[in-house]
């Protein structure tokens, strides 16, 4: 079974490249740690290659829909909210991590999204 992690980033926030990289990094760590605790088998299989894909959505509404779809399919997710020290307001949701989880399950949610 192929296991991957997908990070979905909002593009409406006009974050700089460095800011996006930092937020994606936060999402990767949060998602991996969540799955390490909740599903060690998936985590162990994912850990070998650590497949990650970064996708984009246009706004918070689309991001919330991806999150809701993950909840409905019982796929682990983690949300990143910014501290507000630099480019965006405190508490702004910037991205989410879906998985690490089985690729086929994640693709049901994110298969139509575009690469960042």
Sequence positions of predicted segments:
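Glycine- and Gly-Pro-enriched alpha-helical subdomains that act as flexible
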Residues: 2-38
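Short, well-ordered secondary-structure micro-motifs
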Residues: 18-20, 66, 90
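Compact, glycine-rich, soluble single-domain proteins
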Residues: 25, 33-61
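Acidic-glycine-rich active-site phosphate/pyrophosphate-binding loop
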Residues: 1-5, 68-72
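Short amphipathic alpha-helices within nucleic acid-binding modules
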Residues: 61-67
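Short basic, glycine-rich beta-strand/loop surfaces that mediate nucleic-acid
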Residues: 7-8, 48-58, 72-116
